[in-house]
């Protein structure tokens, strides 16, 4: 049995989970998320726990089992606590600022790069060189953070660029010359 799939999901008291067929709706203090899951998986809901049950031991069912449980757990965690990713801008003159709800990055290009805030995503800029992306959907927060990082990924010679907080950037030695 899948080690992830067989874990039971605990539901906090301020979160409600409802199932309509294979569509789950999770509501909590931070917001609401809805997702349709694989029709082969079934859900056993008790007072404050949910268990994902697979019909057979086939390879397809085993692979989907753990994924379904992880996605549902992320939904519960997102509406109760939320998710957050922090990015750092490293480089001379690299800075970020807010323009309304959108993020504007000055990262060495001839023009500022503007990133629009999607529904459910908020940006926070601290000290002009730290950007915090937060929201209820783990997928959405990760995708937006990845898009921001891809504007100017860290380069290996001087380490300049946008990186995740705590990310290790492998450095290379420059040419030695004659």
Swiss-Prot record:
GO biological process, one term: cytoplasmic translation
The entry's keywords: Ribonucleoprotein, Ribosomal protein, RNA-binding, rRNA-binding
Signal peptide region: none
Lineage top rank: taxon: Bacteria
GO molecular function: rRNA binding; structural constituent of ribosome
SUPFAM superfamilies the UniProt entry points to: Ribosomal protein L6
Coiled coil: none
Pfam families: Ribosomal_L6
GO cellular component term of the entry, any: cytosolic large ribosomal subunit
SUBUNIT field: Part of the 50S ribosomal subunit.
PANTHER family associated with the record: 60S/50S RIBOSOMAL PROTEIN L6/L9 (PTHR11655), LARGE RIBOSOMAL SUBUNIT PROTEIN UL6M (PTHR11655:SF14)
NCBIfam families named among the record's database cross-references: L6_bact (TIGR03654)
Similarity comment text for this entry: Belongs to the universal ribosomal protein uL6 family.
Task of the protein: This protein binds to the 23S rRNA, and is important in its secondary structure. It is located near the subunit interface in the base of the L7/L12 stalk, and near the tRNA binding site of the peptidyltransferase center.
The protein, known as: Large ribosomal subunit protein uL6
The species this protein was found in: Staphylococcus haemolyticus (strain JCSC1435)
């Amino acid at each position: 049995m899948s080690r992830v799939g067989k874990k039971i999901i605990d539901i906090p008291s301020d979160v409600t989970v409802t199932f309509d067929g294979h569509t789950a709706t999770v509501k909590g203090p931070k917001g609401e998320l809805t997702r349709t899951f694989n029709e082969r998986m079934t859900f056993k809901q008790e007072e404050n726990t949910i268990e994902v049950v697979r019909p057979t031991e086939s390879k397809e069912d085993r692979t989907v089992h753990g994924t379904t449980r992880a996605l549902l757990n992320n939904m519960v965690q997102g509406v109760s606590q939320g998710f957050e990713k922090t990015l750092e801008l490293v480089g001379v003159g690299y800075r970020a600022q807010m323009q309304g709800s959108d993020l504007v990055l000055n990262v060495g290009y001839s023009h500022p790069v503007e990133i629009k805030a999607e529904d459910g995503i908020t940006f926070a800029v601290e000290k002009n060189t730290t950007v915090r992306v937060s929201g209820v959907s783990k997928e959405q927060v990760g995708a937006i953070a990845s898009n921001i990082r891809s504007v100017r990924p860290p380069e290996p010679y001087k380490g300049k660029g946008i990186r995740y907080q705590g990310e290790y950037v492998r450095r290379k030695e420059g040419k030695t010359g004659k």
